[in-house]
């Protein structure tokens, strides 16, 4: 899973909403269609999740459902319970007795990802990822992450955006890793690619050294395959040719350098495989639709205004 680890380290959550809700009696809320990653974790009790054109899911305590590509759905106390818009639900959920033994405790949230960087995995994931999470202390990275998210959501002095961002990033990547461990080895998708001894080596090398001017010959040698076989297998499993994936990876790293550092474009360019500021800027605009300078200004504006919201 070396190649997967490199990708997971680069994926980051942004535009954060984290909600801890405790409800009893008939209840239900509807989540609007959207592109954000959405999750619901049942910490206590049970809940039902309904989707258009899909079977209703019953979640018991300790179960998590994540919608990697968003999508409309409803969460309720029963399979046919009424669901109101989420904003209405949150505004009217006062009066619930916290000590009601029949109450349901939910930890829910949504966040966005760099969808360009995350696209290979998002394409491979199902519409809904359901996981059973053991919540005993030290059970797994996923249970530890959810335990910390619950603590942050319940903290009255909440406001540490950096902590929550890191926890939500961890929630996504550990959920991906857990799901990847559970799928069939015969699956032909990005997660099978990162577990393949051939394709994973090439992916890992691209992740480690995006600045290198990789050729198809060099990548196929890393994979231990002929050029034709490597190109065919890579494209079939990853969903795009090797150099298209490499460009996607480079632009994802460039985005993080633009957001997190004050490096000049001339300094960023060689770190992501471009010989000049001009060639980097041209490639970035082609991939992202804006110039690197425009992207950095927009990112600084988002950072200044803040993104974290919480309701309890």
Residue spans for each PLM region:
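Intrinsically disordered or compositionally simple regulatory linkers and C-terminal tails
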Residues: 304-311
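Generic protein-terminus/edge-of-domain signal
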Residues: 1-64, 71-99, 116, 308
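Basic/polar phosphate-binding segments, predominantly the helix-turn-helix DNA-binding elements
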Residues: 170, 174-180, 201-252, 269-298
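Glycine- and charge-enriched low-complexity intrinsically disordered segments
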Residues: 98-106
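Residue at a beta-strand N-cap/secondary-structure junction
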Residues: 56, 213, 262-263, 278
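An amphipathic alpha-helical interaction segment
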Residues: 107-122, 127-204
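Short helix-to-turn junction characteristic of helix-turn-helix DNA-binding domains
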Residues: 42, 206-209, 257-258
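Hydrophobic residues on short alpha-helical segments
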Residues: 39, 150, 203, 252-255
């Amino acid at each position: 899973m070396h190649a997967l680890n490199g990708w997971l380290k680069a994926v980051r959550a942004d535009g954060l909403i984290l909600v801890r809700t405790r409800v009893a009696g008939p209840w239900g809320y509807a989540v609007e269609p959207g592109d954000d990653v959405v999750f619901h974790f049942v910490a206590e009790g049970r809940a039902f999740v309904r989707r258009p054109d899909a079977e209703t899911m019953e979640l018991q305590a300790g179960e998590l459902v994540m919608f990697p590509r968003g999508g409309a759905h409803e969460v309720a106390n029963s399979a046919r319970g009424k669901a109101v818009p989420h904003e209405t639900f949150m505004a009217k959920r006062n009066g619930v007795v916290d000590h009601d033994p029949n109450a349901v405790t939910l930890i829910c949230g949504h966040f966005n990802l760099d969808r360009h960087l995350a696209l290979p995995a998002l394409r491979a994931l199902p519409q809904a990822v359901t996981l059973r999470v053991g919540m005993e202390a030290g059970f797994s990275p996923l249970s530890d992450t959810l335990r910390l998210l619950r603590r942050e959501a319940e903290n009255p002095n909440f406001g540490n955006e950096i902590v929550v961002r890191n926890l939500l990033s961890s929630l996504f990547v550990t959920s991906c890793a857990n799901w990847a461990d559970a799928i069939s080895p015969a699956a032909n998708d990005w997660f099978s690619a990162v577990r393949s001894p051939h394709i994973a080596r090439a992916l890992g090398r691209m992740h480690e050294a995006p600045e290198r001017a990789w050729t198809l010959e060099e990548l196929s040698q890393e994979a231990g395959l002929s050029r034709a076989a490597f190109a065919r297998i890579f494209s079939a499993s990853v969903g795009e040719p090797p150099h298209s994936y490499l460009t996607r990876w480079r632009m994802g790293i460039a985005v993080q350098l633009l957001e997190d550092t004050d490096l000049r474009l001339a300094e960023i360019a060689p770190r992501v495989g471009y010989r000049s500021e001009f060639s980097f800027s041209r490639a970035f605009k082609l991939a992202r639709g804006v110039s690197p300078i425009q992207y950095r200004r927009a990112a600084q504006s988002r950072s200044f205004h803040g993104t974290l919201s919480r309701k309890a």
